[in-house]
Amino acid sequence: MSKTYVGSRVRQLRNERGFSQAALAQMLEISPSYLNQIEHDVRPLTVAVLLRITEVFGVDATFFASQDDTRLVAELREVTLDRDLDIAIDPHEVAEMVSAHPGLACAVVNLHRRYRITTAQLAAATEERFSDGSGRGSITMPHEEVRDYFYQRQNYLHALDTAAEDLTAQMRMHHGDLARELTRRLTEVHGVRINKRIDLGDTVLHRYDPATNTLEISSHLSPGQQVFKMAAELAYLEFGDLIDAMVTDGKFTSAESRTLARLGLANYFAAATVLPYRQFHDVAENFRYDVERLSAFYSVSYETIAHRLSTLQRPSMRGVPFTFVRVDRAGNMSKRQSATGFHFSSSGGTCPLWNVYETFANPGKILVQIAQMPDGRNYLWVARTVELRAARYGQPGKTFAIGLGCELRHAHRLVYSEGLDLSGDPNTAATPIGAGCRVCERDNCPQRAFPALGRALDLDEHRSTVSPYLVKQL
């Protein structure tokens, strides 16, 4: 760390807190000129200064590690591979730009995303000219905006998390179970009437009517699911102003995005209420992040536990930084949140060599995989299917695969690492995976479905190869 140049990150923290260089220099007990040199990468960040910065700002030292840029580097690299732009940029130049100017790199990625969406909408509008379609829509997909909101905050929302934790502690002073205390809070404090219904229909799990102050919950939900729905509605009633402020801070571009963000924040609050941070963090560490054991201990679903684990990034009490995904049999990724720099392609598709997809052939079984991304970084992935059974005959159920991954350097904290070689030795068998065929740079992958963007193909009509799209070697 003695030769680490992270001026842009120090400048980012200072600007976010509204400190002047002189004020921050005084807090760090260094001269303003020294701080100015650090911010402009003239001088490196020493261990002593790093420790003082982490104390002043309450951030983990890993905030200054280059690994935190992984996703942004991959996203910017994906932009440069766009054939429409017709540019050729060396990957090292991309990494240098992200390191020196992360804000500018993020702006380029966001502009390209809007360009791509606008192009798609223009094509759709052209097709709709002879139909009743208007071709209108938000410049950004609502779910993408909300997903990026959580990612930019490392999937941890301190104000909402601590509010839920404090409320849970207050309610449990009565020494009752959480379901009873949530019911008491809703009925006695907010005057809500709670009805358990069996006739809400196949598509409705719960419904709250503000006009009548009535909360209807499907009897088909498990006790844990019913508690979660009550906690989510309590979020609006107790902390509606906080949620509104957080949505405003997110600067969402459409009403749909704002509504989806409010829903996501309410669900975050519910998870933080059912699984309060400090206790859950301590139990998770004690159980070595055994998801099934935690699920049994808290009487909530495997998916709920896995998702909550991906939010344990409180600066003073960090858990393992996880990436959480949920996919279906067709490869659709319906949920993805990350406290790490793990990159998902925006060009479509993921990787068939990833163990998340193998779980559908082994329903209910935990599968563990050491996987290596094209940049050489190794991850430990834990995957299992979850099934939401139908409430009646003839109604289709739902089956998903849940993936939980972390960088290999954190894997020793997980029970799933037992018996695995965590040395990262190049000779150790790690499955080579990628973010998706269109952006994956592995030249000879036998599972490649599409050629990589921006790469010239080495085609020969008189030759057959394992990989259908060999790349020309320069």
UniProtKB/Swiss-Prot annotation:
Involved in the control of the glyoxylate cycle. RamB negatively controls the expression of icl expression during growth on acetate as the sole carbon source. Does not regulate the expression of other genes involved in acetate metabolism. The keyword Transcription regulation applies. It comes from the Bacteria. Induction: RamB represses its own expression (independently of the available carbon source) and is negatively regulated by PrpR. One of its GO terms (molecular function) is DNA-binding transcription factor activity. The keyword Transcription applies. GO terms for cellular component: plasma membrane. This is HTH-type transcriptional regulator RamB. Keywords: DNA-binding, Repressor, Transcription, Transcription regulation. Belongs to the short-chain fatty acyl-CoA assimilation regulator (ScfR) family. It holds the Pfam family ScfRs. Gene3D superfamilies: lambda repressor-like DNA-binding domains. Was identified as a high-confidence drug target. GO terms for biological process: regulation of DNA-templated transcription; response to hypoxia. Disulfide bonds: none annotated.
